[in-house]
Amino acid sequence: MFEEMMGTKPVSERQKFDVDALDGYLRAHIPDYPGGPLTVAQFKGGQSNPTFKISAGEQHYVLRTKPGPAAKLLPSAHAIDREFRVMDALHKAGFPAARQYTLCLDESVIGRAFYVMEFVEGRVLWDQSLPGMSAPERAAIYDELNRVIAQLHTVDYAAIGLADFGKPGNYFARQIERWTRQYQASATETIEAMDQLMAWLPKAIPPGDDTAIVHGDFRLDNMIFHPTEPRILAVLDWELSTLGHPAADFSYHCMSWHIPPGQFRGIAGLNLEEMGIPSQEAYIAAYCERTGKTIRIEDFNFYLAYNMFRLAGIMQGIMKRYVDGTASSAQALENGKAARPMAELGWTYAQRAISLLKDKQ
């Protein structure tokens, strides 16, 4: 699975760019850059911003760009400058994010905006059941995930220069409105569950507010682990990051406990205790202990419904790019088809929230 998703391939015709121009730019902007000949290979995984492994001699880097010139971009998508900014600030603050080298917003250099960061050697773990590991190894991996998301949500974002990285407060209302707009802009068919969620979610937001840096896609396969230790070296894919409610980010991360192994490699229905994987209740308790935050269990169905709505919106965006011919991965159609079942699962959790509310009345 690792080779299938994170191996490299020759750069596709649609994503080709002037390698010599890139080499010249890097010579001028990266200290100790060894210079060409520069070789470029495209990573197979990822649908949004094309990502490349670039090598100059024995030195390796990661190049991330906006999609090629033919791409039709949603208004707020592909903001690579934000990815660069948040990773740069977090890396300098001691959080496990890749070191950033240079950001170029001048599209005349290679035909699109791009940034370059370090290439981090390590493991990407795709299956959340962690096959082939012992129970203690699984427990250590999950504890490290919990530690790192708790670390992220307790970073003083203002102190590291990210006070204006998003709008503090009212996060759920703004995000529901945003993903409603983006879903409607990318719809290719009618999904009744999405219509129901778009109507219900704005009226069901739990009371209370909090603000932290939120990753937006904090899941196992967006981590690079140390080759042999249960230690996260770098958190990847910051394209959805902003200032937001940490409960939204954490509950998204907890969706694995509610998705069966056949869908997005979830862990619902597995014998977690035997496997060494914590229960959701224990995982939430560990997060709350590390952060000092409180998550009300009665609000969790809303959080799950919201995140499944949001994920369905992301999947629908991938489907739209597939239909338009601008998706940058062969996985696009498979992922796009997941929009409907994800929305339907989200509506199931919304109905649970509605039922619990009725029981309390």
Where are the predicted features?
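All-alpha amphipathic helical-bundle segments outside canonical DNA-binding/catalytic cores
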Residues: G166-K167, I295-Y306
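Juxta-kinase regulatory segment immediately upstream of eukaryotic protein kinase catalytic domains
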Residues: M1-P34
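ATP-binding pocket architecture of kinase catalytic cores
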Residues: P37-I213, H226-P230
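Catalytic-loop of the protein kinase fold
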Residues: I213-H215, L220
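Active-site activation/catalytic loop segments of kinase-like enzymes and analogous catalytic loops
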Residues: A248-G292, Y306-G325
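Activation of the activation-loop gatekeeper triad in protein kinase-fold domains
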Residues: L236-S241
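Helical subdomain adjoining the active site within ATP-dependent kinase catalytic cores
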Residues: K293-D299, R310-Q361
